[in-house]
Amino acid sequence: MCSSDLKTTLLLIDNFRYDQWRSISSLLRGYYDVAQDDFYCAILPTATQYARNAIFAGLMPLAIDKLMPNKWLNDNEEGGKNQYEEEFLKRLMAQNGKNWKFSFDKLVRPEQGRKLVDNIQKVYDADFSVIVYNLDRKSVV
């Protein structure tokens, strides 16, 4: 997790390809310091259900299922498979002794993007901000 003396924003763009990142990264650099711009490969499945839950829980998917079975839905089960991400992150922060002021926003629908823009100060005020943007949907903002 990030250093406690720096404000940090994690921008997680779901369904985002590396070539898309390369095309917009220069625009973001005017507003944010990009600490690292590397390409990584991992054994973690990249399907949204697995990847995003693992990122926020700090656990592999099988461990999430074993530790919190009431918060994990398998592929064959109906329901939202990423509905506990903020809860997973709170748990991870507590386990690591991080008592940061944080904000967590998911942008799936256009009105969620507009609401975030209207309340952007909460992102600036937080020690750690997470913005999850689902690129698979129509443009949010």
Predicted regions and their residues:
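Short, small-residue-biased leader/transition segments that mark boundaries at the very start
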Residues: M1-S3
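Secondary-structure capping and boundary motifs in well-ordered enzyme cores
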Residues: D5, R17, Q121-D125
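Generic structural signal for short, solvent-exposed loop/turn connectors between secondary structure elements
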Residues: D5-K7, G30-Q36, V140
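Generic, low-specificity signal for short hydrophobic/alpha-helical stretches with a mild N-terminal bias
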Residues: L6, L10, D37, E111-G113
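Beta-strand elements within well-structured catalytic alpha/beta cores of enzymes
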Residues: K7-I24, I55, S129-Y133, S139-V141
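Catalytic-core region of right-hand nucleic acid polymerases
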Residues: F16-F56
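His/Asp/Glu-rich, glycine-adjacent segments
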Residues: C41-V141
